[in-house]
Regions:
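Active-site beta->alpha loop and helix N-cap motifs at the rims of alpha/beta catalytic domains
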Residues: 5-127
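Short catalytic-loop micro-motif centered on adjacent basic/acidic residues
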Residues: 11-12, 36-39, 95-98, 144-148, ...
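A short, charged/proline- and glycine-enriched loop
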Residues: 5-8, 226-230
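Catalytic alpha/beta core domains of metabolic enzymes, predominantly
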Residues: 101-229
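Phosphate/diphosphate ligand-binding glycine-rich loop within oxidoreductases
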Residues: 228-312
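Short beta-strand segments
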Residues: 12-15, 39, 64, 118, ...
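Non-catalytic positions within long, well-ordered alpha-helices that form the structural scaffold/packing
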Residues: 29, 89, 137, 188, ...
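Short beta->alpha junction loops
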Residues: 13-18, 120-122, 147-150, 262-270
Length: 312
């Protein structure tokens, strides 16, 4: 059995073009979410750090300048990035995001205890992902955030295994995109230090990003919840399904130690055994699954038993 760890810090990401718009967002971010990431790379004017610090009150505040190469909009120099992030810290921001590719091991000269060192691979999980994780951990940053586009189930499982092997309170790994949804739901169960969600509907800052309030309510991120088994929605596209919210609310109301997660697959017959084996190895056995398009007919063919009503 595992328990969704209370120590995972849930972070709501906010991306707006002006300081006033960011301050407006601060008033409507779910009050239960303890931390906010301010995406400075989306600002079209100079950041007013003292005003932003005041607007977000006592929440843990993370300043991020995501580069274009890693999925953001910032195109300035390394020196400009260092100056802006240092100014954020001086104004009372608690943490800053520093991309490893930009900073190397030096973290732009910023204090490691207030840095989230990050790497984002938009193409997929790199072949040397273990070595990359090691370099990031060696930087001395307070937190390590390794993110990659999950091109399919195999990538998602690699990221979950990576997270499971580094559950010491500093490390976070998850995937972007449809296949990455599984990792966003499960990485906190495997010891992720951080979990990122969109602050508001329609304002995701990365592909496949869930709402921060859904991470809290649906997947129990940031609050303890025992999990003895997983149940899953299996389909080609699963991001818009209400099934996780409905099932997890029922599990919690009934006091059942289970979690229902979305899993994007290409082939039910080929990938379901892989999924079951990988989850069992992680200590999260798959107790059952429901299926959606395009696997409904295939599910009847691979099932161990089929009731007579199937197909009617």
């Amino acid at each position: 059995m595992v328990t969704t760890p209370q120590r995972t810090l849930l972070v709501a990401s906010v991306s707006r073009a002006t300081n006033d718009a960011l301050a407006e967002a601060a008033r409507v971010v779910d009050a239960r979410v303890p931390a906010v990431e301010v995406r400075l790379d989306a600002l079209e004017e100079a950041p007013d750090f003292p005003a932003l610090r005041a607007a977000f009150g006592g929440r843990t505040l993370l300043a991020t300048l995501r580069s274009r190469a890693e999925g953001g909009r910032f195109q300035g120099s390394t020196g400009e990035a260092a100056a802006l992030l240092a100014a954020a810290l001086d104004a009372g921001f608690d943490l800053v995001d520093v991309e490893l590719a930009r900073s190397g091991a030096g973290l732009l000269g910023l204090p490691g205890g207030r840095v989230v060192v990050s790497a984002h691979d938009l193409e997929g999980v790199p072949d040397d992902v273990e070595a990359l994780a090691g370099r990031m951990e060696a930087s001395g940053a307070r937190y390590v955030k390794l993110v990659a586009t999950a091109r399919g189930l195999g990538d998602a499982l690699r990221l979950l295994r990576l997270q499971s092997s580094r559950a010491g309170g500093r490390f976070t790994a998850f995937g972007m995109g449809e296949a990455g949804l599984l990792t966003r739901a499960l990485s906190p169960c495997l010891g992720a230090a951080l979990s990122f969600g969109a602050a508001l509907p329609g304002e995701a800052t990365a592909p496949g990003q869930l709402l921060a309030s859904d991470l809290l309510d649906v997947y129990a991120v940031g609050r303890p919840r025992p999990v003895e088994a997983l149940f899953a929605l299996l389909g080609g596209r699963v991001s818009h399904s209400l099934s996780p919210a409905l099932h997890n609310a029922a599990f919690e109301a009934l006091g059942l130690p289970a979690l229902y997660v979305p899993v994007a697959l290409r082939s039910l017959r080929e990938e379901l055994p892989v999924l079951r084996g990988a989850l069992s190895a992680l200590g999260l056995p798959l107790g059952g699954a429901s299926v959606t398009i395009p696997f409904k007919e295939e599910a009847a063919r691979v099932a161990g038993a089929v009731e007579g009503s199937v197909g009617n």
